[in-house]
UniProtKB/Swiss-Prot annotation:
InterPro entries: OmpR/PhoB-type_DNA-bd, Sig_transdc_resp-reg_C-effctor, WH-like_DNA-bd_sf
Protein name: Putative uncharacterized protein YbfI
A GO MF term: DNA binding
Recorded name of the encoding gene: ybfI
Keyword Transcription found: yes
Protein's UniProt keywords contain Magnesium: no
UniProt entry keywords in alphabetical sequence: DNA-binding, Transcription, Transcription regulation
SUPFAM superfamilies, sorted: C-terminal effector domain of the bipartite response regulators
Biological process according to GO: phosphorelay signal transduction system; regulation of DNA-templated transcription
PROSITE patterns: OMPR_PHOB
Residue ranges the UniProt entry marks as DNA-binding: 1-65
Amino acid sequence: MIALSVCWQIVRYLCRIRQMXGLNAIEHSNYLRNYMGHLRQKLEQDPARPRHFITETGIGYRFML
């Protein structure tokens, strides 16, 4: 599970994939994207326009309170 505890913290995509999937990171490259989509569905008021789980293109995700 990904723990996001600091506002403005960028969760680097490849770092998190490697932590979750180890050496099989390439095989699971869509896992984090799907996981973030599920988090948005559950926690955002409007998942199509997220305010808390922001995608940083080419970098990863930003969690904002």
